[in-house]
Amino acid sequence: MDDQATRPTAATSPVLVIAGLTGSGKTLAIQQLEQLGYTGLEGIPPDQAVYLIEAIRPRHPALAVSLNLHTPEYREQFLAFDRWRQAQGIPFLFLEARPLVLLNRLSAHRRPHPHRPGLGLLEAIEQEVRDLAPVRERCTHLLDTSELNSQQLRQQLQALVHGIPQPLNLRLVSFGFKYGAPPDANLLFDVRFLPNPFFQPHLRHLTGQDPPLQEFLFADPVTQSTYRQIFSLVQAFWPHYRAERRPHLTVAIGCTGGQHRSVALVERLAEDLRPWAVPTDNPALPALNIQVQHRHLLDSQRELEARFGPPPPAAGVEQQQVRIPLAGVPAPPHD
């Protein structure tokens, strides 16, 4: 991709060029941009794009051009067009989505894939990803539409054309490997090597949300070291996802059943990332919209009760949150 320090922005250019994978939402993006005041041109071969842009933009304050890159000839023409685009300082948005998402979207149309009509649908999708990889590398803005509906796509485009930074939707998921890992995880951590509260009878029926279990787990040096490394990686990675205008980042942490260790680490991670969570007084600052999901917590609890019976009655004493400080991890802000 173009260097971020020198890339042109849609907020300062009257023209926006769009390309992307079939099914990623190029047509919908043009429609949404037209509602934002743009004149839209769709399916333009690269060798015609320069002429059309130069002919139309003097009469239109904002112009969005979606390129047709389905044939090898068009992809060869793109290189010459892109040299002109860069010289003009025109931003270039590339739309993509995960292959299985594209498969589901395109299956509803029940027609051959326009990129490689002779191939099976999934095979054609995977081939298009490979064919357009050099095009993707030249974009100034990258948008993954896998989890966007039309309204969310409009919000992302509106933020793009107005130069408004958007919060990254950071989804923190705990899960149990015995039930299956989440298929949409961007970062996945296996913490089954940590001390297992299941083998502590007084902790077995608790969850990673309970302070006694958290205290037991985070008193262990290996847990502390593991958590620090997970926190450091997530803290280092999420700004780059946001800089590339990816709307979502899913971080999954798994243990055996998804009740104890993974839940405790996800809860702690959400707490420690709070200083970067929205709302923020300065919209230009990096910001997160943190969502927590304990994917298999109830499944594990039901299975545990079926095996060992219901949990013992609570002692009736309110549990106090115990937070063991860890070096290299910031303390949460005071409310």
UniProtKB/Swiss-Prot annotation:
Domain of life of the organism encoding this protein: Bacteria
Residues bound to ATP: 20-27
UniProt keywords, alphabetically: ATP-binding, GTP-binding, Nucleotide-binding
Annotated region described as Disordered, given as residue ranges: 306-335
Molecular-function GO term, any one: GTP binding
NCBIfam families: PRK05416.1
Job of this protein: Displays ATPase and GTPase activities.
PANTHER family recorded: RNASE ADAPTER PROTEIN RAPZ
Family: Belongs to the RapZ-like family.
UniProt name for this protein: Nucleotide-binding protein CYA_0911
Species this protein is from: Synechococcus sp. (strain JA-3-3Ab) (Cyanobacteria bacterium Yellowstone A-Prime)
